[in-house]
Amino acid sequence: MIRLETRFASSFVNSRKFESFLTEAESSRRTLHSFQGKGNEYLGWLNLPKEIKESEIEKIIQVAQRLRDSSEVIVVIGIGGSYLGSRAVLEATLPFFRRSSKGNPEIFFAGHHLESRYLSELMEYLKDRDFSVNVISKSGTTTEPAIAFRLFWELLRKKYGASAASRVVATTDFSKGTLKTFANVEGFETFTIPDNVGGRYSVLTPVGLFPLAAAGIPIRKFILGSQNILKDLHAETDPVRNPATYYSAFRNYFLSEGRHIEILANFNPSLRYISEWWKQLFGESEGKENKGIFPASMDFTTDLHSLGQYVQEGKRILFETVLSPSDVHSNLILRPTPDNLDSLNFLSGNTLGHVNEQARLGTLLAHADGGVPCLELIFPDISPESLGEVMYFFEYSCAISGYSLGVNPFDQPGVDAYKKNMFALLNKVGFEKEGDFLRKRILGN
């Protein structure tokens, strides 16, 4: 079970004032379960772990294995919630260094930006390798993945001819949209994105599960982790004993005290993309109506040598939440040397994991002493099962926190602003007048 440790944060809290935030958080949790709050049409994720059908899990595993058996590389095309969840789990659980082969393919991502060098080099890399594609898009019209899929579909057809379609799996709408039509015409295997689950809450749908299965991750264990924590979070009505409600209360309390930035920190580089996924989850869910905590992330100890100075002595507008797995399976032991030229013999006999843990504790003490409240999210280890717990915990916490803030945690109206400008500047049909106006603005006219 996940635990929220507050030993380096509680001294920053006025207990009487905090009571009202606990009450509000539990009220928001009840609103969530009433299905009467803002955005309630997108609550399909709430009970999803216990509603996933075994037949769908089995189909995902079987289709993923077919691609694994025929591919040295699988390219996952998506952006935002259509890619960050699966990448977070893959980066956390797969070996840092591994050899790929048919049956154990490399996983690369595309369609999450518009930079041409990356796509060009990836396409060149694939020319002499067998590869397949999982394209993920509800509509099929999101610019970045749509462009990437056009390029990789052309490469597949050139390389495999009539059999190219067998190397594409499309995760999209059940019945409508550009990608669904494309899939029907070409005969792609498809999986469905539920209508009542938004992208950033979709890691437990085929959006997240298929790429995990394609990488060889045991998705049943990932689902099991989310199922286990769901039972606890849904049942516990005491906001102090429910870690998600407790976390939400702390977040909004610190915001009320002028701490507008939350840093999600880790001491394990494999967790970096958990932070990237978390930033989208909270940023899109809470950043609206001129409200919200800005979600940032840091990778320690690396960033202690760059941003650590600001955290220690900069403006006191921060609080930290530290991802803290209890077991990191460290087996590197530091041995003494006869000459001790590097002056490190004082560490002899210690595992590198022990050294990292002392760095973590020393950092928490220093930051708290410097005026930065630090929460610790304690979970068992960096395994698919534990990550299933962590990701459902954050989804549940985010919904509660958003309701406490008074916003709809399930929409993202602001993301269309840049798209409209981009379409106008690219002369998309229907945007011509806006394009002329924007070009004049850019030129200062």
Curated annotation (Swiss-Prot):
Catalyses which reaction(s): alpha-D-glucose 6-phosphate = beta-D-fructose 6-phosphate
Enzyme Commission identifier(s): 5.3.1.9
PANTHER family tied to this protein: GLUCOSE-6-PHOSPHATE ISOMERASE
Gene Ontology molecular function: carbohydrate derivative binding; glucose-6-phosphate isomerase activity; monosaccharide binding
Organism for this UniProt entry: Leptospira borgpetersenii serovar Hardjo-bovis (strain JB197)
Pathway where this protein functions: Carbohydrate biosynthesis; gluconeogenesis; Carbohydrate degradation; glycolysis; D-glyceraldehyde 3-phosphate and glycerone phosphate from D-glucose: step 2/4
HAMAP family per UniProt: G6P_isomerase
Compartments reported by the entry: Cytoplasm
Family the UniProt entry places it in: Belongs to the GPI family.
Record bears the keyword Cytoplasm: yes
Disulfide cysteine pairs (residue numbers): none
Primary role: Catalyzes the reversible isomerization of glucose-6-phosphate to fructose-6-phosphate.
GO process terms (BP): gluconeogenesis; glucose 6-phosphate metabolic process; glycolytic process
GO CC entries: cytosol
Alphabetical list of Pfam families matching this protein: PGI
InterPro entries reported for this sequence: G6P_Isomerase (IPR001672), Phosphoglucose_isomerase_CS (IPR018189), SIS_dom_sf (IPR046348), SIS_PGI_1 (IPR035476), SIS_PGI_2 (IPR035482)
Protein name according to UniProt: Glucose-6-phosphate isomerase
Record: active site: E284 (proton donor), H305, K419
Keywords: Cytoplasm, Gluconeogenesis, Glycolysis, Isomerase
